[in-house]
């Protein structure tokens, strides 16, 4: 059979997906985190892989699904949180814009799986399945009640799950995980389709979402999930030493308030007394596309007048950030390679060929 006749849609998908293969899995496994540091990788959306100097591996909000893929149904799902928020009827054109950089089924070394809240782009059944099938049988699944309910519903044993609420602390080897208050108002209107929100006091946030502070021997990382801006960031900054803070940034469409703005990101960094502030989530949805350079421009305008004690860092999906080695950098660039140029003799027709 000719090659073109043997190729199918399925063979094409299997040969190209996930786009990065196991490249990042291997990089994370091979990384030796130096004492006094921690390393983390951006997995897309708010997904983070954190590795401590003791070799402890935890992932947060690792999501392996996609957004809209068809114009088939022009209407938004009845009762969707965005419909409640803005009174819209049309389908939200949120297409996934970044590739899959980590293969969940190539994960072998992991010490905990965490989720910030139960929205589809923060918790993933494929990740749960891969960890259950391929990793140690004592890896815990940590999250608020709504996330644990999802995991158990998918088949994760109850005894493998840990429900956390603000104030709880979970120790995973040399990483101390603090569950803190979340400020994700969108989560409060994520309700069953037949349930009305109008005129009804929302139930508490604590069962739905938490923020996380990861305290490692080499520094601390604040993960805010999908939280909006809140004055309570200042309380968290008063109570904890925060080195690096991650915040959900995006260009909110007309009639929508779901992501922090560039000004919100700076206010968050100041309130938390962070050393570095990194935007995330702006990478993933086409209709929330935003330029993170706006944060840096605004920071440059304000930093001297307001005496900011933090710097912004513009990351790329799949990239690594090491605290404190990268604390004075402003932007990430993927490794460019060719550092070994001219270690062997070039094979060119003549020296001035290039």
UniProtKB/Swiss-Prot annotation:
Subcellular location: Cytoplasm
Keyword vocabulary terms for this entry: Cytoplasm, Hydrolase
SUPFAM superfamilies on file: Metallo-hydrolase/oxidoreductase
GO BP annotations listed: L-ascorbic acid catabolic process
The keyword Manganese belongs to this UniProt entry's keyword annotation: no
One Pfam family linked to the record: Lactamase_B_3
GO MF: L-ascorbate 6-phosphate lactonase activity; manganese ion binding
Protein name: Probable L-ascorbate-6-phosphate lactonase UlaG
Natural source organism: Shigella dysenteriae serotype 1 (strain Sd197)
